[in-house]
């Protein structure tokens, strides 16, 4: 499981940073890639990675500001340029209006897609658990921005314990159906009368990962709830230390506020993104260092950077 950042800038494309988009790679878990936001130029950024557009099965949009959605019609169209047998349906989750935005762009440009898009639109009254599969659950809450904006909490369900096959062999259990029974938690009796207790050969379930990905926001308690105990918190850092007033007026956060959210939520790791173009080079290093005074496990990410979870 990895996060790869396709765009880490704020507002408009800059030389060092494209606008907002990231992907959560779940290839080992479910052979899928989930995209969060799709600012303009996202498909160009993808060309610099190993990401296959057909693997992108779900797109989560945080809000309707252009730097988070203007790349969506182009990406969806480019995704169509694949062999027919590789076409897979796509789910798009986002605020009310995302369907109209996408379909208007596709219709007026004469674009035809060889796959279906399933839209899931939300307003403030329909948030909470927005998606569940056998391996993942996704929750959403309203953040505090200048327009309706959501943050997402992706929860991996606990992983089953693994079978200690070597220990079973040493215990004299023949490979075959008995292995399967033990793996399923059944006790078995061998021909010599010995009983094999399944739980002695299966490790404890492994806690699933929690990944919190926030859209643009002022400092808000909703961010804390979404990030509670998260393995990774991705939080915007449009402004730096001392910029709290201007951040609030524009519906954004500073690096220090993001760090405080991570600390209050007892998150394990904080990744800062959505950085204003006025911060470059050493300024970015300083933003990270300042945030570390509040939350030590902080990192300010760069475009195309990949982070393991």
Swiss-Prot record:
Residue numbers binding Zn(2+) 1: 63, 65, 145, 216
Active site: 67 (proton acceptor)
Keywords: Endonuclease, Hydrolase, Metal-binding, Nuclease, tRNA processing, Zinc
Entry keyword annotation includes Metal-binding: yes
CDD domains with a match to the protein in the record: RNaseZ_ZiPD-like_MBL-fold
The protein's required cofactors: Zn(2+)
UniProt xrefs under Pfam families: Lactamase_B (PF00753)
Catalytic activity reported: Endonucleolytic cleavage of RNA, removing extra 3' nucleotides from tRNA precursor, generating 3' termini of tRNAs. A 3'-hydroxy group is left at the tRNA terminus and a 5'-phosphoryl group is left at the trailer molecule
Enzyme class per UniProt: hydrolase
Recorded superkingdom: Bacteria
Gene3D superfamilies (UniProt xref): Ribonuclease Z/Hydroxyacylglutathione hydrolase-like (3.60.15.10)
InterPro entries membership: Metallo-B-lactamas, RibonucZ/Hydroxyglut_hydro, RNase_Z/BN
Cofactor binding description: Binds 2 Zn(2+) ions.
E.C. no: 3.1.26.11
GO molecular function, one term: 3'-tRNA processing endoribonuclease activity
Binding site for Zn(2+) 2: 67-68, 216, 274
Function: Zinc phosphodiesterase, which displays some tRNA 3'-processing endonuclease activity. Probably involved in tRNA maturation, by removing a 3'-trailer from precursor tRNA.
Subunit structure: Homodimer.
Descriptive protein name: Ribonuclease Z
């Amino acid at each position: 499981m990895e996060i790869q950042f396709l765009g880490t800038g704020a507002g408009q494309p800059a030389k060092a940073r494209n606008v907002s988009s990231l992907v959560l790679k779940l290839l080992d878990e479910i052979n899928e890639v989930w995209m969060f936001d799709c600012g303009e130029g996202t498909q160009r950024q993808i060309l610099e990675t190993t990401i296959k557009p057909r693997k992108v099965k779900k797109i989560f949009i945080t809000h309707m500001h252009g730097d988070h959605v203007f790349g969506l019609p182009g990406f969806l169209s480019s995704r169509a340029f694949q062999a027919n047998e590789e076409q897979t349906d796509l789910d798009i989750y986002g605020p009310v209006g995302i369907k109209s935005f996408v379909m208007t762009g596709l219709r007026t440009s004469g674009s035809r897609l060889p796959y279906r898009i399933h839209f899931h639109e939300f307003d403030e009254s329909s948030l909470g658990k927005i998606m569940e599969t056998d391996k993942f659950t996704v929750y959403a809450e309203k953040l505090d921005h200048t327009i309706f904006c959501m943050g997402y909490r992706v929860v991996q369900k606990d992983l089953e314990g693994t079978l200690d096959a070597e220990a079973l062999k040493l215990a004299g259990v023949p490979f075959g159906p008995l292995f399967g029974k033990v793996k399923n938690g059944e006790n078995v009796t061998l021909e010599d009368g010995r009983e094999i207790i399944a739980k002695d050969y299966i490790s404890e379930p492994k806690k699933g990962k929690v990944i919190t990905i926030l859209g643009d926001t002022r400092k808000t308690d909703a961010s804390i709830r979404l990030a509670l105990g998260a393995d990774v918190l991705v939080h915007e850092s449009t402004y730096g230390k001392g910029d709290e007033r201007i951040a609030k007026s524009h519906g954004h956060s500073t690096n220090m506020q993001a760090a405080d959210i991570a600390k209050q939520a007892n998150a394990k790791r904080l990744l800062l993104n959505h950085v204003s173009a006025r911060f470059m080079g050493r300024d970015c290093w300083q933003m990270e260092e300042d945030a570390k005074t509040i939350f030590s496990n902080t990192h300010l990410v760069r475009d195309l950077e990949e982070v393991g979870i």
